[in-house]
């Protein structure tokens, strides 16, 4: 079969890597891909912001399965369009992708269906923000309503800062059109958890849990990013908690979306805060997370194609997945200045030596390749990932590999999974 992956990041490299292991895949394409993906799939040019451009690639490939990596093509309606043309596509429709595309839609949906989440207010002007802040205690979370590549969330330490951040969002200077409306939220305390399920519109099958590290600096300091690393182990949550999350969060979401006429098929990513009051929803993503996909897929031992097709065909079951008991970790190596302004075009050295470390796979994110050498081409450059029988060994392998990679301005967090190893 012919499989097309849409996207160009570390998540897409991990998807390509896992799909390539399937004996059912005869030809693998990625559009647009990146320098590292080009070694494992045929890369095709595409503008992921333009639905016509994506459809043109579909017409060129005529895929038996399309896997959509990033959120933007989903919100443009790529699954609707491909399905209409008879090209099976994995992911939610444009209507169902509103769960991620609009923070205000998601919050109101959660309230309608009595799914636990933080108290909030939806505002469309600085005046509304100042009035709403009277009902909050600092710190306050300020979220841009629309898609902002993981950078539309700010934890304001004071109400004055919250009002200032909201004003910046409204102005369009901070996150463009994504900030025309903002959501204010109570700042929850606890450990964050990424809980992903596969859905066929009615049933769900949970994937193994993962924990992301959003802040750019060690000790969870500095601004939010798209994610600086993640890990996955058997012990993140027990079976009892997993079942609770399925029955009290994932299933009610899928059932609620169907009841509202927007059947949800694909991956539902529940970003949760495990608080003293119980798990609460921070956000939804309608696709595989990045960098969580990298450690999750390193633990997957069954055929990913079978599971994705089950979602499309309406026959998802937990038996679709077989998982390793090993631990896995991904450490993101980023360009100097990220998540702010950064330079690209820096030559990357040491990739072969890093990949030779036992249990390590280096996933490419922001890279390009020319004349046989790799160069930086984005903020998050590489996802250095490792699998081992226990978390400490996986972390040691990943950092040993990181130390072998060199490019001008490279930086990465030195404490991925550190809190988990202290428990």
Across the structure, where does each feature detected by a protein language model lie?
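A conserved helix-loop-beta module that forms one wall/lid of the active-site cleft
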Residues: 92-152
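Internal nucleotide-binding/catalytic subdomain
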Residues: 152-293
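Generic C-terminus detector
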Residues: 367-371, 375-423
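Generic long, charged, amphipathic alpha-helical segments
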Residues: 344-383
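Active-site "cap" helix and flanking loop/linker of ATP-utilizing ligase/carboxylase catalytic domains
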Residues: 246-268, 285-357
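ATP-binding N-terminal substructure of ATP-dependent carboxylate-amine bond-forming enzymes
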Residues: 1-94
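Short acidic-hydrophobic, aromatic-tinged amphipathic segments that line or gate anion-handling sites
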Residues: 43-49, 121-125, 156
């Amino acid at each position: 079969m012919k499989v097309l992956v849409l996207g160009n990041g570390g998540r897409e490299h991990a998807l390509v890597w896992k799909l390539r292991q399937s004996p059912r895949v005869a030809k693998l394409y990625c559009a647009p891909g990146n320098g590292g993906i080009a070694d494992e799939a045929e890369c095709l040019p595409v503008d992921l912001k333009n639905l016509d451009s994506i459809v043109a690639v579909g017409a060129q490939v005529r895929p038996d399965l399309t896997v959509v990596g990033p959120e933007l093509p989903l919100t443009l309606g790529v699954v609707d369009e491909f399905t209409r043309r008879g090209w099976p596509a994995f992911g939610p429709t444009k209507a169902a992708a509103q769960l991620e595309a609009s923070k205000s839609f998601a919050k109101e949906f959660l309230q309608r269906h009595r799914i636990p989440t933080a108290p909030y207010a939806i505002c469309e002007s600085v005046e509304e923000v100042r009035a709403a802040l009277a009902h909050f205690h600092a710190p306050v979370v300020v979220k841009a309503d629309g898609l902002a590549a993981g950078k539309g969330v700010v934890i304001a330490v004071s109400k004055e800062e919250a009002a200032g951040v909201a004003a910046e969002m409204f102005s369009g200077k901070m996150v463009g059109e994504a900030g025309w409306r903002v959501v204010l939220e109570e700042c929850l305390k606890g450990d964050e958890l990424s809980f992903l399920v596969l859905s066929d519109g009615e049933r769900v099958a949970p994937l193994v849990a993962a924990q992301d590290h959003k802040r750019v600096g060690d000790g969870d300091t500095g601004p939010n990013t798209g994610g600086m690393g993640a890990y996955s182990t058997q012990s993140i949550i027990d079976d009892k908690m997993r079942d609770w999350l399925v029955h009290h969060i994932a299933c009610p979401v899928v059932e609620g979306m169907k009841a509202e006429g927007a059947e949800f098929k694909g991956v539902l990513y529940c970003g949760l805060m495990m608080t003293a009051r119980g798990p609460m929803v921070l956000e939804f993503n309608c696709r595989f997370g990045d960098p969580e996909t990298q450690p999750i897929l390193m633990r997957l031992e069954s055929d990913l194609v079978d599971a994705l097709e089950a979602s499309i065909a309406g026959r998802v079951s937990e038996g679709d997945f077989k998982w390793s008991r090993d631990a896995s970790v991904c450490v993101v190596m980023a360009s100097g200045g990220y998540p702010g302004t950064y330079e690209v075009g820096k030559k990357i050295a040491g990739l072969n030596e890093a990949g030779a470390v036992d249990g390590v796979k280096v996933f490419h994110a922001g890279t390009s390749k020319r004349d046989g050498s790799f160069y930086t081409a984005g903020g998050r450059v590489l996802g250095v990932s490792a699998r081992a029988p226990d978390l400490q060994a996986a972390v040691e392998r990943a950092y040993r590999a990181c130390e072998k990679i060199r490019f001008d301005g490279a930086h990465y967090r030195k404490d991925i999974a550190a809190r988990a190893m202290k428990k």
